[in-house]
């Protein structure tokens, strides 16, 4: 088959424990005074079995082998499919985070000192912080956006991201590059968490979602830092506000305001989602209505390009095809990317003519 089965220590512990329980129950018939010892032994073995069983349930290989549902985004589905006990034991894994090796104030301080020495001369000292310009900062984390050309060459009937390709050729006031993220095909909130806080999910238990498990109090982030610099901080996500607990988490990260799909009036939709064009128009609306003299920070997590890509929709017809590849999903995806490219051009063109300095950061 396609599975490789390995016996972990916790699995062996459970098997041995069950065998001992069977042996005690079948071979020993104790008199009343000795029953206390028997019960104590059974309680101890039960604790050992629970510990071992929990370890098995929390094993990634066990979860995959038995097809358990482990997506924390939908805990009700998790409970329904796996059962309440299994779901509860699986979630216990995320209650504790082990401190990474070498993590201490002394070690961290020395690394900051070294980083400062390495960057000496790259930044100029600011004598008067009040004189420093505070540009508006717009960050767009575009759902599922990527340039598939990094995976290999292919030919399309037309360019699917002409504007971004022009930017990559050295446009004025532009820096481009490639970004690796820690998630693939899900757990969008973990990329948000890493970008906003500078932390890494590499230090968290496998499968955890930082927003849901670990952001339970005010947490330093880019938003809270800019808020201290008198920025008005706004998060935008044109979908359900409760997704990944954003409505609870964003205020803890320092956002003054959170706009979800309920804050859009008659937006343009592509497939089932609010388009990037409408999402970017909301940014422009915020800029045009902001308080004069107060800089704006916007963090926009879009929805337009969310999977899946196989369905047909009355409000969107894919117009990008790939030579030699007959794939509805590929055609749909590249056509959506083209829509994003056009929307991004409109946003950048607008702020290129705006009165205030504005920095736009875009990544997928």
Describe each region flagged by the PLM:
Residues 1-134, 155-171, 175-176, 212, ...:
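N-terminal secretory/membrane-targeting segments
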Residues 120-135, 139-142, 147-364:
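Solvent-exposed soluble domains appended to multi-pass membrane proteins
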């Amino acid at each position: 088959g396609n599975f490789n089965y390995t016996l972990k220590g916790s699995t062996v512990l459970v098997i041995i424990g069950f065998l001992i329980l069977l042996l005690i129950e079948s071979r020993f018939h104790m008199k009343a005074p000795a029953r206390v010892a028997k019960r104590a032994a059974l309680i101890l073995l039960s604790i050992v079995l629970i510990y071992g069983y929990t370890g098995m349930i929390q094993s990634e290989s066990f979860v995959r082998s038995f097809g358990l549902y482990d997506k924390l985004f939908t805990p009700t589905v998790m409970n329904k499919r796996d059962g309440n006990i299994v779901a509860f034991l699986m979630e216990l894994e995320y209650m504790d985070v082990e401190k990474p090796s070498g993590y201490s104030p002394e070690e961290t301080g020395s690394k900051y000192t070294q980083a400062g020495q390495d960057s000496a001369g790259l930044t100029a000292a600011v004598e008067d912080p009040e004189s420093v310009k505070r540009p508006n900062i717009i960050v767009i984390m575009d759902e599922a956006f990527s340039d598939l050309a990094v995976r290999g060459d292919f030919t399309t009937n037309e360019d699917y991201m002409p504007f971004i390709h022009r930017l990559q050729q050295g446009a004025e006031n532009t820096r481009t590059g490639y970004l690796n993220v820690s998630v693939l095909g899900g757990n969008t909130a973990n990329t948000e968490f890493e970008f906003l806080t500078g932390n890494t999910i590499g230090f968290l238990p496998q499968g955890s979602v930082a927003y849901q498990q670990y952001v339970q109090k005010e947490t330093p982030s880019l938003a809270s830092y800019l808020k201290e610099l008198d920025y008005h901080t706004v998060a935008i996500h044109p979908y359900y506000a409760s997704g990944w607990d954003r409505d609870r988490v964003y205020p803890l990260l320092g956002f003054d305001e959170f706009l979800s799909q309920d804050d859009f009036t008659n937006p343009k939709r592509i497939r089932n989602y609010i388009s990037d064009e409408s999402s970017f128009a909301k940014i422009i609306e915020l800029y045009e209505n902001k308080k004069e003299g107060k800089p704006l920070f916007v963090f926009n997590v879009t929805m337009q390009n969310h999977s899946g890509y196989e369905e047909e929709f009355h409000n969107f017809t894919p117009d990008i095809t790939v030579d030699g590849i007959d794939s509805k999903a590929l055609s749909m995806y590249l056509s959506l990317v083209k829509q994003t490219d056009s929307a991004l051009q409109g946003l950048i063109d607008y702020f290129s003519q705006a009165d205030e300095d504005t920095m736009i950061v875009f990544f997928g």
